[in-house]
């Protein structure tokens, strides 16, 4: 039987050792190594042997080992044994012993977070993905998982109290199936279901109708935009962009008195029917956020499908350039608006994260076009100044902000595969949420992940044609490939994957680690009341996530990092989730250096020769 501590004859020795002497300074992160280095106790032979197999991989490591034994003669007094250890170390070096696993000899291995051995724990190499020892996920049967999801939603439905009941469940775990069944079971209750997209709205509406549920879906102008006269659609879009949606329907009514536009006539008729409707309603996140308390109080239960923070709050940004803001200050007759702009401009001389008082803008109904969404600007407290000196694509400084989102309802239930308890607590308030993570089941299909390259936008820019090469390698067509929109491949890309079932049960290729601009993470953080150094930039960090220790470009600040990783993971999980691996024996090939749950890491993938597939 082969000794796993010894390299085979075919494995090459190196002139230089794998680790430089500087690593010795970090070895004290290991509790057992501290015992050895500080002479706090006598180590057993097995403990010393384990440490030695790690130290021989380090320049001057052998010398360090012997120096420490000689430094503590009261613990290691036997000169003969010291001579034996010198011989042992020489033999181990000559035979290229591997660093021994912590689990085999360390008495502390169950109480610390460690990787395979001391070296991989304290010094994670770039492009490596070190599995954290002892990390495991508990899986249940599909039936247990589905039952748990239904029970969680049912409990939240019956619960009393003004709270956000947040239920995290895997993609494909039966979230929509569960709440539709609940709608059928409690047919006397009025449910308001909000989903991310019109596409998903139609799908949920159809499923509910097939079960005989009394339900309507909110009409959408976006869904009929191709049939609306271009000049009218352009005017409608501008009203929304200006933050004046309340002008849209009076404008449509006025246009319908001038000429007959069938699609708009039908849209307005559906709106009128909806007003008088007393059954269940399926709508979108955006529509939900526009509903006032009086309208929301008509419903017995509000269920939000998917993470509304990620999909519809943080993604709903506004911005205005400094020059446009100065022009607005000169033109406005509203003293409160003028004062707010003045404070913002003054603070921007020394700050990037700026807080100014919010107020509700009095719209006089003037039909003149506005330069941007003034109502949202007035209601916003936190702004982030994007400086053109720090961003290549900016021609001048710009104030960015998240458009305020209101949740005036009595109780909300959110079901999502990507919701994060800590982030929900920051946004809604820790005392205002009730968070439950459902049981998980193992994938029926397979998620293969290739993590040697970051596959960020800049990585793909430096490796032109990479996505096309990978498509050829795995025999993927554009429809089965998800990557950045800029690549121009297929109908799905990062940012628009939710709610699509076109790839269910199919082998797919996902390429990319979807970073956003740094300002967005900071903007999200200040909007949640998080304090941080606004000058901090992303840098290479060693992090632990999803059972792996690896190097990743992110923030040092823990809260900023949390938001950053949550957004990346949410986007990747949505993309991978299109194949519905939980219920289908298909394969997803993921090229990203961010590890996902249940991923099988494929090492040493050769991008030139196809080795490793």
Labelled PLM ranges:
Residues 125-613:
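ASCE RecA-like P-loop NTPase motor cores
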Residues 1-7, 333-336:
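Extended, Lys/Arg-rich, non-catalytic nucleic-acid recognition/anchoring regions
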Residues 4-128, 178, 193-195, 503-511, ...:
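Modules that initiate DNA replication and primer synthesis
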């Amino acid at each position: 039987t082969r000794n796993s501590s010894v390299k085979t004859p075919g494995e090459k020795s190196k002139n230089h050792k794998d680790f430089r002497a500087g690593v010795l300074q970090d070895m004290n992160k290991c509790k057992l190594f501290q015992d050895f280095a500080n002479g706090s106790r006598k180590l057993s032979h097995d403990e010393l042997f384990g440490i030695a197999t790690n130290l021989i991989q380090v320049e001057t490591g052998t010398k360090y080992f012997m120096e420490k034994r000689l430094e503590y003669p009261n613990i290691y007094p036997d000169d003969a044994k010291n001579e034996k250890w010198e011989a042992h170390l020489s033999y181990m070096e000559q035979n290229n012993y591997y660093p021994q696993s912590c689990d085999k000899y360390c008495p502390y291995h169950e109480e610390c977070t460690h990787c395979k051995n001391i070296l991989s724990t304290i010094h994670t190499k770039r492009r490596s993905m070190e599995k954290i020892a002892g990390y495991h996920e508990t899986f249940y049967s599909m039936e247990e998982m589905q039952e748990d999801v239904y029970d969680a939603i049912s409990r939240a439905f019956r619960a009393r109290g003004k709270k956000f009941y947040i239920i995290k469940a895997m993609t494909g775990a039966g979230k929509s199936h569960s709440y539709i069944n609940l709608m059928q079971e409690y047919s006397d209750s009025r449910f308001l279901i909000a989903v991310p997209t019109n596409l998903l709205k139609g799908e949920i509406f159809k499923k509910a109708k097939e079960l005989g549920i009394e339900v309507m879906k909110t009409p959408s102008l976006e869904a009929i935009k191709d049939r609306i006269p271009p000049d009218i659609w352009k005017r409608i879009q501008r009203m929304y962009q200006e933050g004046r949606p309340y002008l849209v329907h009076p404008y449509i009514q006025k246009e319908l008195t001038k000429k007959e536009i069938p699609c708009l006539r039908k849209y307005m008729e559906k709106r009128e029917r909806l007003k008088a409707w007393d059954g269940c309603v399926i709508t979108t996140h955006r529509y939900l956020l526009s509903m006032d308390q009086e309208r929301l109080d008509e419903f017995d239960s509000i269920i939000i499908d998917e993470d509304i923070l990620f999909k519809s709050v943080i993604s709903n940004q506004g911005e205005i350039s400094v020059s446009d803001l100065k022009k607005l200050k000169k033109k406005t007759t509203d003293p409160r608006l003028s004062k707010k702009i003045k404070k913002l401009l003054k603070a921007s001389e020394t700050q990037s994260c700026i807080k100014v008082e919010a107020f509700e803008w009095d719209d006089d109904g003037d039909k003149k076009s506005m330069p941007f969404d003034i109502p949202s600007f007035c209601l916003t407290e936190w702004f982030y100044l994007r400086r053109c000196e720090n961003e290549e694509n900016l021609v001048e400084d710009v104030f960015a902000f998240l458009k305020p989102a209101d949740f005036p309802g009595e109780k909300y239930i959110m079901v999502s595969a990507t919701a994060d308890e800590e982030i929900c607590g920051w946004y809604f308030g820790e005392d205002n949420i009730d968070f439950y993570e459902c049981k998980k089941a193992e994938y029926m299909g397979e998620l293969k992940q290739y993590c040697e390259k970051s596959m960020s936008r800049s990585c793909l820019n430096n490796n032109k044609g990479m996505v096309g090469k990978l498509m050829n390698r795995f025999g993927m067509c554009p429809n089965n490939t998800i990557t950045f929109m800029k690549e121009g491949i297929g109908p799905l890309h990062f940012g628009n994957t939710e709610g699509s079932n076109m790839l269910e049960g199919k082998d797919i290729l996902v390429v990319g680690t979807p970073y956003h601009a740094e300002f967005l993470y900071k903007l999200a953080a200040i909007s949640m009341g998080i304090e941080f150094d606004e000058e901090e930039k992303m840098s290479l960090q060693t992090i632990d996530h999803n059972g792996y220790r690896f190097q990743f470009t992110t923030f040092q600040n823990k809260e900023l990092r949390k938001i950053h990783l949550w957004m990346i993971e949410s986007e990747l999980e949505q993309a991978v989730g299109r194949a519905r691996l939980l219920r289908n024996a298909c394969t997803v090939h993921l090229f990203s250096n961010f590890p996902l749950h249940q991923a099988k890491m494929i090492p040493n993938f050769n991008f030139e020769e196809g080795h490793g597939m």
